[in-house]
């Protein structure tokens, strides 16, 4: 009996120890699983909070970037694809050659080089004149008090509500009449086109510069007047140096708008040798069954180069010029 009991006790002790070990292992496994689940839940909550706070902004930014870059990539692909159709450019950069650029400069009936020079001349002259005349007008409105000042500022804003497209017929008749007296300012002349552009650009740009001029303390003008400086000396010696950002912004915006303007330029410039890029490039796609979109895309790429170069050169002035010019002191 005692031997049996001893053997029974001897055999049950290891069984109890094994059960305890299995229970401990199970508890440890359950605890480990719970910790992992908590970590996973925490990660999910952290990602949800991040996406709700900032993540959606990144998603919107990526979508907007793709939406903006895709047309540029498509135009580049069409420019380097000599098939001449946009359908052949659906597979981006499937074919790369310079055939379109060669054809662009080898067509004597379509002088692309002359169009490029015309665009640069019209754009530079108009931008420079807009900056200079607009700065003088903004200085007068900002620093001088004269009869009709408020009415003049209000008129500048009201005139900008009517697009130049509504005045195309009037512009055509006006230049047609001027060409009978002063041919250099009439139809077919680049100088006449520059005058039309100046009339449309001075209003909004003058008001934009007027707001920036008001941020310059008038104490500088008063100190210069005490030293005997005139308005001309104050304007050229002091004010222009302090308002360089807004001058750069106005010049850049004017140049971009003029380089891409088509409607008025197509009405005023009738001679192919005097046309700008926007009007000249349209001839590549104007005729049905003979349009060449590849050459058109190549010309558009080259036309964008000066604008991009000017934008990069004046980039440091753009933000400060627009933000300060939008606040009227």
Roles of regions detected by a PLM:
Residues 2-8, 15, 21-329:
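A hydrophobic, multi-pass inner-membrane permease signature
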